Structures are given as C-alpha cells and as structure tokens.
C-alpha cells in the first residue's frame, strides 16, 4: 500500500484537502471567538450556522461557473478570491461590530465553498474510483484538524491567526490550480467499467441521508458550541484530537472490503450518536456526549465527502456533485440552527427524545435505499462468467466420456 498510496500526486491532493479543512474549521473557530465579543452564546451559534450555510452558495456556484468561465477569467477569479479572503479574515479578527463581523464571515464562507468544491472535484477526477479514496479523505481531514490544534495551542493572537489562515488559503488555491484537469473526468473509463445501477437515485438518497444525519450531528454540535461560547469548555483543545483520530479510523474502516461495509458502519455510528443525545437529555454526562460527538463527527464528514466524490464521476456535471456532501451538510445546519438551539435550551427531554428517535428511523430507511441504489453491476458479469466456466467444464466432461444428449440431460 505504501508504494501505491504515498505518491506525489496523491500527497498534493491530500495537502489541498487538508488545507481546506484547516481553513474551513480554523476560520469557524476564529469567527466564534470574535463573535462572542458581540453577542451571547446563543447568538454565536446562530451566527455560526448562518456563515456555514452561506458556504452552500459557494459549493453550488462552482458547479455552475466552472464550465462557463474562460481560463483567464478563472485565474483572475482565483487571485481575487485570495485577496478578498484576506480582507474578510482581517475584518473578522477586528470584530468592529456584529454586522461587519457577520458580513465578513458570510463572504468568506462563500469563497471557501467555491474552493472546497474545486478541491473535491480535483480529488474526484483522479481518485474517485481508487481503492483508497476514504483513506485519502480521512488522512486529509485528520491533518487539517491537527494543524488547527497546533494553531490553537501555539498562536494566541487573533491577528496572527488571520494571517496564517490567509496564507493557508493562498496555498490551497495554488495547489488546486496546479492540479488542473482538462475537460471531463480523466478517469471516466473507470466509472464506465464499474457502473452504478441507479446513480441519480443513489445521489438523491445520499443527499437525503446526509440531510437527516445532519439534524443529529448539528444538534450535538450546537450543544457543544453553546458550552464553548459560554466558557464552560474550549473545543479547540483535546477534543479536536479525538476528531482527527476518528477521521483516520473512519477512512481505514470505510475502505475495508472495498467499501462494502461503509454504509453499515455509518449506520452504527449514527445509532451511537442518537443514544448519546438521549443520554445527555436524560441528565447523563456531558463529557460523554462531547467524546461521542467528536468520535462520530469524523466518521460523518468522511462518509459524505467520500460518497459524493465517488458519485461525481457518474454525473453529467461532476463539478456540481463532488462537494455536494459538504453543501447539504452546511445548508441543513443553517435550516435547523435556531430550532435546535431552542430545543436544547427548552430542556424538554420528551420532545428531544421523540425527534431523535424519529430521525433515526428515517435515517435507517434512507441508508437502506441508498445502499440498494448505489450497488454496482459487477456481480452479474462474475456470475455469468462462473456459469460459463461450469458449462465449459461439463462440455469437456461429456466429450471425454462420449455422453449422449440423453445422458447429458440426466446429469444436468
């Protein structure tokens, strides 16, 4: 695996993905800290959901613009995005007012959405059908989180953080420009040789599954963010390492058996997260909920990222689908942000339990449908080949012993 996995091209793609994860999460952490100077913990959670939701615009915008813009316009847009991102990060760390900080966050995450969709498309073009796709995504996610962990523990100045995030974003743009892909997917022949039975149905059910799972994980995330904004914990410390480990482990587990157990593993992780919510609302340990959240969140990110990167090659506009997982996740986060905060603050354990169990039932149905629709058609050729081999063996046996047609019918 070492010779196959650790190649320069894959390392560059993983570095770009890692930088995206680092900037995306690092900017979110910086935004939360700066917004805490302007509003209470509930306001921070709502503002965070707004900026994360705005990234959905960027993810979808890339799929629309990539095929229409000329090469010179793309280069100019990339340079402009780098400058605008630097301005937005500086405005966030200044946090002059609630409105200016929120506006800078909204613009920044639109840019991050475009960059994220671009880097996921690059990954789909080269590694969408690779055996180690989930490991590639998982390692990148873990590296990005580890970089953020180092920044949080070594850098304690908002201005310096903004500068570092800006440089990382510029490096990300440089790498994705370096790994350009001409025309459609370069490895489309691999997709044609291993077709999914119902690719668009699988894509729709995957989106529906991610949307439902987001309701579970976003609720846990909001509960943790409320504690962070309120000062009861610092989510930039050791919990981030748990998240990094879960990203690594999920990548290995999802690729085990050529990915055939990926949906089952994610189903079990979702069950664990649902139980965790029920334990917390019943008065259980919040620390336990924090640990389970970070363990499961890494699995969730690698799951939807891998699923959409793989499906992109089967679509007519792969640029639109490669980053769809993150787009759906962030859009659902903004849609349920205020509702989940109100539900958590209400302390109504009965409503929370009913909502959690209902969501889990829907997730179970969605995962089953996605598994069926996402199956490839490789089993049928193998079965036909086996039948042909058996027929050839029987024909050779009949010729050897000079069996009559009647004797052959009896033996069959």
Model-assigned labels for residue ranges:
Residues 51-63, 144, 234-259, 329-338:
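Transmembrane alpha-helices of Major Facilitator/SLC transporters
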Residues 261-302:
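C-terminal transmembrane helical hairpin of 12-TM major facilitator-type secondary transporters
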Residues 112-127, 298-316:
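Intracellular juxtamembrane helix-capping segments at the cytosolic ends
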Residues 385-412:
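Helix-turn-helix DNA-binding segment
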Residues 1, 129-133, 145-210:
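Intracellular loop-helix junctions on the cytosolic face of multi-pass helical membrane proteins
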Residues 98-118, 285-303:
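Hydrophobic core of transmembrane alpha-helices in multi-pass small-molecule transporters
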Residues 315-346:
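A late C-terminal transmembrane helix in Major Facilitator Superfamily
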Residues 2-48, 194-220, 291-295:
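Pair of pore-lining "gating" transmembrane helices in MFS-fold secondary transporters
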């Amino acid at each position: 695996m070492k010779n196959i996995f650790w190649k320069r091209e894959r390392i560059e793609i993983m570095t770009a993905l890692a930088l995206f994860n680092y900037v995306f999460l690092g900017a979110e952490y910086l935004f939360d800290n700066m917004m805490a100077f302007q509003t209470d913990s509930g306001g921070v959670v709502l503002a965070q959901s707004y900026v994360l939701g705005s990234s959905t615009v960027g993810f979808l915008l890339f799929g629309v613009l990539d095929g229409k813009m000329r090469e010179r316009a793309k280069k100019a847009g990339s340079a402009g995005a780098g400058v605008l991102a630097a301005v937005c990060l500086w405005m966030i760390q200044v946090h002059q007012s609630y409105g200016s900080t929120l506006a800078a966050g909204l613009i920044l995450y639109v840019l991050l959405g475009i960059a994220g969709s671009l880097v996921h498309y690059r990954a789909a073009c080269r590694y969408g059908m690779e055996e180690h796709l989930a490991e590639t995504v998982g390692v990148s996610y873990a590296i990005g989180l580890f970089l953020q962990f180092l920044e949080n523990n070594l850098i304690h100045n908002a201005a310096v953080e903004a500068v570092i995030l800006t440089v990382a974003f510029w490096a990300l743009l440089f790498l994705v420009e370096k790994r350009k892909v001409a025309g459609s997917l370069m490895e489309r022949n691999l997709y044609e040789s291993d077709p999914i039975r119902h690719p668009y149905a699988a894509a729709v059910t995957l989106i529906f599954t991610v949307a439902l799972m987001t309701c579970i994980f976003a609720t846990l995330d909001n509960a943790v963010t409320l504690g962070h904004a309120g000062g009861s914990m610092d989510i930039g410390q050791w919990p981030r390492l748990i998240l990094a480990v879960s990203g690594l482990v999920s990548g290995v587990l999802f690729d085990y058996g050529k990915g055939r157990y990926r949906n089952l593993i994610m189903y079990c992780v979702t069950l664990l997260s649902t139980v965790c919510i029920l334990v917390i609302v019943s008065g259980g340990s919040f620390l336990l909920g924090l640990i389970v959240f970070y363990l499961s969140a890494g699995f969730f990110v690698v799951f939807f990222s891998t699923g959409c990167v793989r499906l992109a090659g089967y679509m007519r506009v792969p640029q639109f689908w490669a980053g769809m997982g993150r787009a759906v996740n962030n859009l659902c986060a903004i849609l349920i942000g205020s509702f989940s905060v109100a539900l958590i603050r209400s302390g109504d354990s009965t409503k929370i339990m009913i909502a959690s169990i209902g969501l889990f039932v829907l997730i179970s149905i969605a995962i089953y449908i996605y598994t069926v629709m996402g199956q490839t058609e490789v089993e049928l050729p193998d079965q036909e080949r086996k039948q042909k081999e058996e027929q050839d063996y029987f024909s050779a046996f009949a010729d050897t012993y000079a069996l009559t047609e009647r004797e052959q019918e009896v033996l069959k």
